[in-house]
C-alpha cells in the first residue's frame, strides 16, 4: 500500500510539471486532497507531547518505534536520559491502549500522576517503597500534581471535565488511587466492580519474584497483564557488561546481581536478580493455583524494551474425554480424571518448553543471535602460567570459512602466524573480480589474535587425532571391528551371535558399520543451546517422571506427522489409531510409513479406500489370524488354480484384485474354457459382486493397472447382469406397447412382455422354471430367439456390453500366469497432440501395413482409416492390421498374425490405462505409439461403486512427443488452445473468427421448424441428445462420442438450465466441443455459463492477434462438546405503515419485467394458433379436443400487478402440454448402477445417519393392519372419500398399475423471470382410486409414524405436519457464533427424475421397517410400468416409474428419497442440523467441511439435475430460516406473499376473506420486526436485485391485519 501511494504521488508530481494548465490544476487539487486526508488521518491518532530535548536521530527512533501515536517534539526540557524518560511515557500509553477503556486496571509500580493527568479514574497504582529511589520518585509525582493545581489556581481555571472524576477520587479516597504495598500484598478492594480486571507492569516486574507473579495476579482476579521490561541477548554470555546503545544504558552482571544504569550519568543504579529476570524471559506459564495458570506471550520489541502479556487460562477447560468400555461408573470417572490430570500436566510442561525447544522462536526474539555461535578464547598468564577462558559471539559462516581453509595447510605451513595472517586478510577485505570489497564479517579486530589462536589449536588437535587414528587402525585387510568380533567368537563359540547382540544392546561396545566411533569435542555452542543451559542452571525445573508417556506420545506424534502428508488426514482419530496399533502390536511409525507408501503408490500396493480413516488403516494392517469375517486378507500361501466353470456354478467368480478372503487373482491359466460359448448358462450369481470397494492391488503400477482393468470388466458385467435379474423378478405378465432399452420375452407365449428397442441380441439372462437365473448366449431364427424347454423368461438389454466383456475376460484370463499379468518390455511413446494436429494423418504416414498394427477405439474410426489408406486403389489396410480395440481383445489369436513390429493406438488416452498395457503386451511389438491429447476427455469410470484410484489414470510411458500445430482449428480456437497447453500452439487454417453464441429464450424454442441447426449437432449430456432426437433433429451426438472427429460446421446445444459440472472453463468437454469444427461453431444455450464467457472473449480478440497463430506449414515438432443453549426470540412489534405502491416497487425491483406481462389470454392464444408438439406414445381422444363451453364468472381484480395467471380450463390441449412438459420430459443422466446392491448400501447409510441406534431394527411386536390404524386414516378423510368406499368389499385388489391423470387449474407462480419467455405448464396430479388408498393409506401411515418415531429428532427434521413455531424450536439451538455452512440442494424435475433405482431405495426402506412381502411386491408392480388415463381430456399413456404426485406415499416418499440422496453424498456424521421436506432440504455443517462433487454424484447415481448452494441463511419450504444469537425465527418469503396478492382466481369477497386469513397464518412472524435486517440479507442472497425491504414488510403487516384495508387490494370484476 505504501508503494502504491508513493508511485501515485510521483505520477501526480510529474503531471504537475507538465504544460497543460487544466491537467496541472486537477493534479494540484488531487495532491492537496491527498495531503489533507493524510494529515486528518494523522490527527486521529493519539497525541503525545515529547518535552525533553532529544537529537534528530533520537526523534526518528521514537517516531519509527511508535507509529500508533502522533508525537510532538517540543525540545523544551533538558533532563538526564531524556530519550529513555520520554519513551517511558510512550510505553505507558502503548500498554494502556491494549486495555478496554474504563476497565479496572492495576498499574504495578506505576506513575499515578500520569493517570490523573489523563483522567483515568479506573486505575489503581501499587507503588511500594523498596529503596530510597522509590521514595524520591513518589514524592516527585506528588509535586507534579501540586504544581499542576497551583497553575490552574493562579490562572483562575478549573480542573478540566475529563480529569475531574480522577482528581476528586484522589482527593477523597487517595488509597483507591495509589497504595504503597507490593502488588502481592495490595489490599485494594473490588467490591463494586463486576467486569474484567487488567494489570500493567512498566519496568516493574524485575522486583516481583516470578514464582509469586501468577498467584498475585489471580488474587486480584486479573484477566490479562501487559508488561514491558529491558533485556539484552548478550546477558546470556559470560560478558559482565552489556550496552543498550539506543537508550545509552547498560547492564552489569556480578553473579546473580544485575545492575542497570545510564552511561555518563550520575543517577542511581537499579539492582535486580538475574535469575529472576531470566525466568520472565524463558518461562511460558506462571502457575497461579492448582487450576489456573498465566500464559506468557511476547508481543513486540521496541527500542531495547520487550513487551509481553500474561493471559489467564483455566486448565479445567481441557477436554476430559477418555475411551471406556464397561459398566463400572466409578471406574469410568476415576479413569477420566486420571487421563485429564495427565493431559493437563503434560500440556503445561510442553508449554514451559516452547521457547527452549523452538529455535525459530529464539531467532525471532533474539534476532541478533541468528547464525551466531559462541566460541571460546584462551589466554595464559606469563607470571603464574594460569590459563584463562572467555567466550565471544562470532558468525558461524566466518568460523567455518577460516577452519576449512587452514585445514588445507601442510604441516609445515600450519603455524599461528599463517592462521592470523589469513584471518586478518578476510576480516579486512575480500577481492571480487580483481576489485577490493569490504568484508562481509564485522568481527571486532581486538579479538582476531585470540580467535586465531583458538582456530590454530583446534586444527592442530584435529590433525594429531587423524594421525593417531591412522596409525592405530592400519591392521591389514580386516578392520578393528572385525578383529574384535573374531576374538569374541573364538571365546564363546556357537553362542557368539547372541553374545554379540547383548554387547551391542548394553552399549558395552559401540560400532558404526566397519569402524569404531570416536567423539571429538565441539568447537562452539549455539546461542539456543546456551539459552537452555543458562535457564536450567538458574531455574529449578519442575520434576515429573513422565518419560514413558512422553516416549509413547513422541512416537505417536512422529507417526501422525508422517501421516499428515495424506489427503484428509485430519479425519484420523488418534485414540482409535493408537488402540489399533496396540491391539495389532504394530509400531506406530512403521504403520504410518507403510500407509504413506501405500497411499502414494511407492510400495507396489494400492488400497482402494478413498480416505485414510482409522478403520480403513486397521483393515489394511491386520493380518490373517486377526482378520474378522469379510475383511481383507493378505497372505503369501500357495493357492490352487480354481476352475472357472466350477466357480461360476458355485457363484464364486472373483476379481483380479484382492477381494474377500482370496489372496491372489483367480483368473489363473486354465484350459477348461477355451471358447466364449462355454460361458453359456453360467449362473448369474457368479457374475454379481456386491462389494468391489475392498480391493487391494499389488505389484508394479502397470501390473496394478492391468488388474484394475480386468476388475472393471467384471464390475460392468456384474452390474448389467444384476439389473437384468432384477428386471426378470419385477416384470409382471402384461403386454404393453412401449419400447424400452431392455426387453423381457415370455417363452411360453412367445410374446415380449417388455419390447426392446433393438433386435438380435447376442446375450441375455434366462429365468428357468425353477426360478434360477443364468447368463445365456442367444441364437436367432426367423421366428426370433431360440429357447430351451426349461426357460421361463429371457431378459435382454441393448445398452450393456456383457457379451464383449465376457469375450475380453476370456482372452485376458488366458494371458495370466499364476494370476499375474505380464508386462511388455516394449518402448512406449506418448504422442501428445492438440486437437486437429493430424494424428491420424501422421499414423498413416508412418505405418508399414506389412508389419505394423493400428488400433482405434471405435468402428467408424477404423473404417475411416481403412478408407483413407486404400484411397489410391491398392488394398493395404485390412481388418487384420487396422482393428478396433474391442475386436482385438475379443478375437485375440484368431487372426493370421499375432506379432507386430510397431503398434499405433489412436486416441489411446480415452482407454483404461490397464487396457493400453494389455494391448502393448498382446501385440508383441518392439515399440508402441500412443496418440492422444492430455487435455481432452480421459477415460471415465462409469460403473458406480467401482474404485479407479487417481494414480491409475496416469499412463507410464518411456518418451513423450508433442504436436503443437493444429491443421483443423481456426485461429480463434487456437487462441483458446494456447491457454490450455504448454508450448506455443499454431494453426494452418485460414479461418479467423469461427465461434459464436446465441441465448435462446427457453428449451421449447429449439425445434427443427423454427430453429434449423447447421452442420453437426452436438450436446453435452445424453438427456439433451435424447430431447433433440425426440423433436425431430437427426444425427445428434454428445461431445464425448465425437472426440477425434472433424466437421466443417457444428451446432452445439444446451437445453439443461441447471448447472452441468462438465461445462467449466477448464473442463476437457469444453475443449473437445470447441475443437471439432473447421469453419464455424455456434453455441445455443438457455442459460449463461462458462462456455458463453469463453466464446464472448474469443469474439473480442482482434484479428491482428489471431494472425500471430498462423503458419504456412506444419512445424517439427477430536471430539469437542460445545455449549448447548436454547432461548427465545426478541419481539418488537412491526409498525403498520406503507402503501400498495411499496409492494409494487419491491416486486418490480426483485423481478423486473414480470408485472408488465399481459398474460390473461395466453391460454386462448395457444388454443387458437397452430402448435407443434413432440409426443411420446399415447392415445388421444380427439373428440374431446374442444372443451364444452362454460360460463366464466367474473373474479376480483388485484391492484398489485404480478405474473400470476388466470385459471385455466381443463382440455385435451392444456392437459397434453402439461403432460409433455412434465411426465414426458424426464431426464436420463444416470450411469451404470448396480441397482439392488447400491440401493442396499444407500439404505444402510440412511439408517446409520438418521435413525436412533436403538430403533434401527424393525419392531416386530406391532401390526401394520389394525382397526385403530384404519380409524386414524378414516378420521383424516373427507366425507366424499368415505362415500366412494361404500361398495368396496375389500376382497380383491383393483388394478394397482392404473392411475388417473388431472391438472391443477391454477398455474404455479415461479419467483424468477421465466414467465417472460415460457408458457408455464400446469402441475399434473397422478392418483390412485380411493379403494387402493383405503388399503395402502393406513399401511403407509403406520410405517411413516414408525419411521418418524425412530428419527433422531434432535438433529433431523422430517417436515410432516409441522407448524412454523415447531420449525423455530428445531433450529432454535443453533449457535450463531459457530461458523457454519448452510447448504441447500436444489433438484429440477424431482418427481419425474425418479426411476428404478429410487424405487428400489424406497422399497428397501419400507421393507426394513416391516412392510409385508406380498403387499410390498404388489405396491412395487403398481409403480413400475403404469398406465395413466385422463378421462376429462381423453388421453391415455404409459409411464415407467416416476413419482406419482397423488400417491399415498408421495410426500413421505419424496422426503426419504432426498434424505437418502444426501446421506449417500455428504458426511452426515458431521451434520449439525438437517431438515427435509419433499424435494426441499436444508443442512447445517461446520465451516470448512469438504464435500464431494455433488452434481456428478447426483447425475450418475440419482439421475438428478441438482445443484448445491452455500448460503448464509437457509431457505426451506418457502420460508427463510434466520438463526441469530438468541435462537431462530422463520419468516415467510415476502416476495412470495406479494406474488399471491396478485392472484386472479379470487371468486368473491368471502373467498377473499378466507384467502386473507390463510395468508395471516403463514405470515404471522412478519409482525416481529426485530430481525428485519437479517431477513434483508437472506432475501438478497436469493434475489440479487432486492432492496432493503423493511418498508414492504411493514406494509404487508398493515394490509394483512386489517380486513377492510385488505379489500382495497382488489376491485370487483363484475363492475369493471
Curated annotation (Swiss-Prot):
Residues 964-1116 form the (+)RNA virus helicase C-terminal domain. InterPro entries: (+)RNA_virus_helicase_core_dom, Alphavirus-like_MT_dom, DNA/RNA_pol_sf, P-loop_NTPase, RNA-dep_RNA_pol_alsuvir, RNA-dir_pol_PSvirus, Virgaviridae_RdRp. The keyword Glycosyltransferase does not apply. Residues 801-963 form the (+)RNA virus helicase ATP-binding domain. The keyword Transmembrane helix does not apply. GO terms for molecular function: ATP binding; ATP hydrolysis activity; mRNA methyltransferase activity; RNA binding; RNA helicase activity; RNA-directed RNA polymerase activity. One of its GO terms (biological process) is viral RNA genome replication. It catalyses: RNA(n) + a ribonucleoside 5'-triphosphate = RNA(n+1) + diphosphate; ATP + H2O = ADP + phosphate + H(+). Residues 830-1085 are annotated as: Helicase. ATP binds at residues 833-840. Its EC number is 2.1.1.-, 2.7.7.-, 2.7.7.48, 3.6.4.13. Belongs to the ssRNA positive-strand viruses RNA-directed RNA polymerase family. Heterodimer of a large and a small subunit. This protein is translated as a fusion protein by episodic readthrough of a termination codon. When readthrough of the terminator codon TGA occurs between the codons for Gln-1116 and Gln-1118, this results in the addition of the RdRp region to the replicase. This is Replicase large subunit. It comes from Tomato mosaic virus (strain Kazakh K2) (ToMV).
